[in-house]
Amino acid sequence: MSKVLPSNLASALISFALLPSLQRLFPATATRPAAHLVGTPGSGKSEIASLLSSFYGEFSRDTPPAQWADTINTVETLGCPLADAIFWVDDYKSIYADERTFTRFLQAYSRGMGCGRLTRESKVRHEKPCRGLILSTGETTIEGEMSIIARMLVLEIPP
């Protein structure tokens, strides 16, 4: 494992990978963190994410469960059934989600809420909050309001 995980980040990465199994023991009022692995192409971000996700099932670097190119609604819905697992969302780029949309999603995620929506009849739709613990990868750092950055563990993966 030492050849895959950078030695200076290994303890943080493994701790984050095991956090979903302890998540139910935390009070409901605790905010839910997310981790973002940032690095250059070929630095091993997806390999690390698939390795950490493999604590919860079979994953490969080429088949992430979700991508930031998906709509935020899709990301939220795919993460809903993953209450006690890592939810790997690959390849963050600022062109995929504007800052306002991403900020709204991450704030709702950290509170365990869904992004509120209405039906065609203007009735409140049943929320499907993302319950998986988000492990994000990308070549750029996620930027936004300070409240978003405070909710994320941003780890730079060396080339």
Show the residue positions of the predicted features.
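P-loop NTPase catalytic core of nucleic-acid-dependent motor ATPases
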Residues: 1-62
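Active-site-adjacent structural elements in folded domains
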Residues: 1-5, 63-75, 117-122
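AAA+/P-loop NTPase substrate/partner-engagement loops
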Residues: 43, 47-100
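Conserved catalytic network of the ASCE P-loop NTPase/AAA+ motor domain
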Residues: 78-81, 98, 125-130, 144-148
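Residues immediately C-terminal
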Residues: 94-95, 140-142
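Conserved catalytic/switch belt of AAA+ P-loop NTPases
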Residues: 102-121
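Structural recognition of the conserved hydrophobic beta-strand(s) that form the central parallel beta-sheet
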Residues: 115-116, 129-139, 154-156
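Conserved P-loop NTPase catalytic core
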Residues: 143-159
